[in-house]
């Protein structure tokens, strides 16, 4: 089960053009987004550690997105 709140995910889907969004659809997207964010965060942590830092910075996230 995703830790992300469903309401913001619902709003994202509506922002993409949906008139109505089922709760299941929002939950599935929330789960996917959470998995993606965790994988991206792991890469960012690796970049921070490689730079000799314990703190993950925006630049680490940007590098992880490009990697």
UniProtKB/Swiss-Prot annotation:
InterPro entries: Archaeal_histone_HMF, CBFA_NFYB_domain, Histone-fold, HmfB-like
CDD domains (alphabetical): HFD_archaea_histone-like
GO cellular component: chromosome; cytoplasm
GO terms assigned for molecular function: DNA binding; protein heterodimerization activity
Disruption-associated phenotype: Cells can no longer be transformed, grow like wild-type, some differences in transcription occur; double histone deletions (htkA and htkB) cannot be made.
Keyword Acyltransferase: no
Region ranges (Interaction with DNA): 20-22, 54-57
Key words of the record: Chromosome, Competence, Cytoplasm, DNA condensation, DNA-binding
Chief location category: cytoplasm
Self-association and partners: Homodimer or heterodimer. Dimers then assemble into higher oligomers, with the DNA wrapped around the protein core. Higher order oligomerization of these structures can give rise to long, superhelical fibers in vitro.
Note: In a chromatin histone fraction 12% of the protein is this histone. Cells have about 2.5 x 10(6) histone proteins per cell, enough to coat all DNA with a ratio of >1 histone dimer for 30 bp of DNA, cells are polyploid with 7-19 genomes per cell.
Family of this protein: Belongs to the archaeal histone HMF family.
Function: Binds and compacts DNA (about 120 base pairs per nucleosome, corresponding to four histone dimers) to form nucleosome-like structures. HTkA/HpkA has lower DNA affinity than HTkB/HpkB and compacts DNA less well. Required for transformation, participates in both transcription activation and repression in vivo.
The protein's name: Archaeal histone HTkA
């Amino acid at each position: 089960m995703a830790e992300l709140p469903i309401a913001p995910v619902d709003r994202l889907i509506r922002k993409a053009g949906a008139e109505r969004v089922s709760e299941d659809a929002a939950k599935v997207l929330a789960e996917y987004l959470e998995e993606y964010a965790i994988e991206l965060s792991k890469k960012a942590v690796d970049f921070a550690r490689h730079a000799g830092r314990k703190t993950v910075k925006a630049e680490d996230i940007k590098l992880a997105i490009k990697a």
